[in-house]
């Protein structure tokens, strides 16, 4: 098997470009399937009942109709207006995704094909690619840096040092398209639909912080990762998995305390007199289900967006802390917030966090195990014009591991797309279970959760009209009609409408 895969006659470059194009075409096909659903002017019969507020508080979205922008009129939107708002928002997002996907695909082809290499003076008669040219530039920069850098900042000129320069160059080329795309999405698309709360100064500040954090944390981790793989050889999977698990556990604990405060302000819920009923209800709920509640935090999500959210964090077996977005508190009643938290804590009670972590680790382990067939495959590197590092090993000629992982990942892009269906299916199943957990608590939990979902969906202009295949690929959460139907609300709603 290995001997067959290492034949230089295998056109790996053409295969990967074809696979990349196939995945792109499939994703665009899904977008095209979704478009007719977003152009409906009247809610489909299966959705219409959920937009009629027969027995609960109506989601008050004080906005003009979809063709008049998002300024406050002082009047609550009708269910029809709410539906049209969500349709307009979803349609704009899909159109944006189609354009952004096309640009990303051009960037991918430029890196993987010989096209960009001609600008670096590559020999047109030999295999070449954009990544091979970037690697050659990274070698040059690492040697230049070794000559001019202060002693404390010298990192050598070996594979790891060159790989760090390569990753930096790759990130910089990505910024050419990602920065304009992010600016458009934030200040045009989100602004148009009333969600953006950021100023340009805040966006720039966030971008600088994110870039610096990525460099300060990401580059050392990449160095450790590459060293581990090179040190462990063919047995690298188990050691890399231990490294990744350590990173995941650190993020569980460190992100809320070390990273998130750089972007958002956390305040104790007790500091808000108007939300003391939420505090009382949450503490009672936690006590009822034996949730190890630590602190209740409020995060200033409204600083950047009108979207709402709630989550908890903490290592398995230890105290957990709950975080509520201020937008959720402003948009929902105390009973609805409690119902939302009952759903979130249901994930903890049903061990969903551990299940998702375990499934992701299994998926990563299987992927890395498959990568072993290609990390030292000279034919793969040759096809893209990537030279050997020189020297040898028991596995053969040494090639840049960072490029090996990049190319192996490109080979398995279709598989990753298929796994999106399975991972989303698992996630949606767990969401249904968490909804049912909240409903099974009795009392008004089912009704309050229903109206919380309706209100949050309306406030966030969530898509309620979806193509089934598009939804299966893109949505980790069930749609609003699906969740309400599973909660057993549909029959009750129909009775009240008669």
What is the predicted role of each segment?
Residues 401-412:
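Short, contiguous hydrophobic alpha-helices characteristic of membrane insertion segments
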Residues 2-399, 413-498:
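Polar-ligand-bearing catalytic/cofactor-coordination segments
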